[in-house]
Regions:
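Active-site neighborhoods and metal-handling regions in enzymes and metal-associated proteins
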Residues: 1-408
């Protein structure tokens, strides 16, 4: 059953990453490795997201890439890997001993994912494969993942369509007197699942664990979390800094902050909406709330207008911040120093839209733009949408920022 416009092997039960897509990624990987590390001989991919990127499956095993070949070695589940991946060479492994017997003579240097490979994993690897030296290849993989292919963009457009439908169109019907933060978040999450969302939000950062996202009412949106993001929540408990409280019920006169992630077949979009429950005109802080929210809309639209090929990332940040109203300095991004971030297989892809990032934008990059302002004693306001960089400027995948809507 075809669901996306792109030609993908797709059924209701199983959607595989096309073989030509995987091969194109592997070819680009080899080209960048040749450029950055001339004479390289072997690279080992262990992280499940990178394995999915290159092999189209997430298993307990490793993908070994050499200039002349690539082999997916799987401990568990070999059968599932063979069903999901369209790589030509997939083999079972019991341990790294299997690889030690195959890769002889052993190259002197191996390239690994240093950002995610644990010391324990590396020690186990070196027990059977005693490479003389190692180096990181994280920058190579990040460079490849930054530019999205037509296949990847088809998935992100589908995710963005779900995101826009649920948060812009359906959310108001669930914002009712007495609903809890947790219940509202879960209801919206369920609506996304019903429409095809893959149901999790993956992050690079270790503290980024999320499934449902979060809903915050009023001042609970000001509670900072350990995760490096502007949105706040008290969480379900001390141990879980997301979703929202099952005991904080919605009352009139509260801001409703919704940051519920969405994704399709591994590819995410990011979107945040804010509603006001009640009659904003009767709120003593109505002018302050409206002004701060409208400034966030202005900042998002300004940032999006600068997302053009050739623009230097840090210059975008500086140009936008030149138009930033200093009265919001203490509450902007809840202390963060960025305007947004790249997004794709994880929510927090590099680079961020921030100072210090000197790379230039290219068509095919995708960024979430999320200006947000914390209003002490009131709550969090802001907007967020996901934008594709094209030759003709930025195109939103999740809709445009909407005026602050009141739910009466």
């Amino acid at each position: 059953m075809t669901i996306l416009e792109h030609e993908i092997m797709m059924t209701e039960q199983l959607r595989r990453v096309p073989a030509d897509e995987l091969q194109a990624r592997l070819n680009k990987f080899r080209a960048v490795m040749d450029r950055e590390f001339p004479g390289w001989e072997i690279a080992i991919v262990n992280h499940k997201v990178n394995m999915y990127y290159f092999a189209g499956t997430m298993q307990d095993g490793v993908l070994v890439i050499r200039p002349q070949d690539e082999i997916l070695w799987v401990r568990r589940s070999y059968e599932r890997a063979c069903n999901e991946s369209l790589l030509q060479d997939i083999r079972p492994m019991k341990s790294f001993r299997t690889l030690a017997e195959f890769y002889q003579p052993l190259p002197a240097k191996v390239y690994l994912e240093n950002k995610t490979a644990t010391l324990e994993w590396q020690q186990l690897l070196y027990k059977y494969l005693p490479f003389a030296s190692e180096a990181g290849m994280d920058s190579v993989i990040s460079e490849l993942r930054l530019i999205k292919s037509p296949y990847e963009l088809a998935l992100m457009r589908k995710s963005g369509s779900i995101h826009r439908n649920v948060l812009d169109e359906l959310a108001p019907r669930f914002i009712v007197q007495g609903v809890s933060e947790a219940e509202l978040a879960v209801n919206l999450y369920a609506e996304m699942l019903r429409r095809g969302s893959h149901g999790v939000a993956r992050f690079n950062l270790p503290l980024g664990e999320d499934v449902v996202g979060l809903a915050s009412f009023g001042k609970s949106g000001l509670v900072k979390t350990a995760f490096d993001g502007p949105g706040g929540t008290g969480g379900t408990c001390v141990a879980v800094q997301s979703i929202g409280s099952a005991f904080r019920k919605l009352q009139a006169g509260r801001l409703v902050y919704l940051d519920i992630p969405c994704g399709v077949d591994g590819y995410h979009t990011d979107k945040t909406v804010v509603y006001y429950y009640g009659d904003l005109d009767q709120d003593p802080f109505s002018d302050k709330i409206r002004a701060a929210y409208e400034h966030c809309v202005f900042l998002e639209e300004l940032t999006a207008s600068l997302l053009q090929p050739g623009m230097v990332i840090e210059n975008i940040y500086r140009q936008v911040m030149e138009q930033f109203d200093p009265q919001y300095e203490n509450g902007f991004m809840n202390g963060g120093k960025f305007l947004g971030h790249s997004i794709g297989l994880v929510m927090d892809e590099a680079p961020a839209l921030a100072n210090g990032f000197k790379g230039k934008l290219e068509a095919g990059m995708v960024f979430a733009v999320e200006p947000k302002i914390a209003l002490p004693g009131i709550g969090m306001v802001g907007t967020e949408n996901t934008y594709l960089v094209t030759a003709g400027g930025a195109k939103s995948l999740t809709g445009k920022p909407q005026p602050l809507r009141c739910i009466l």
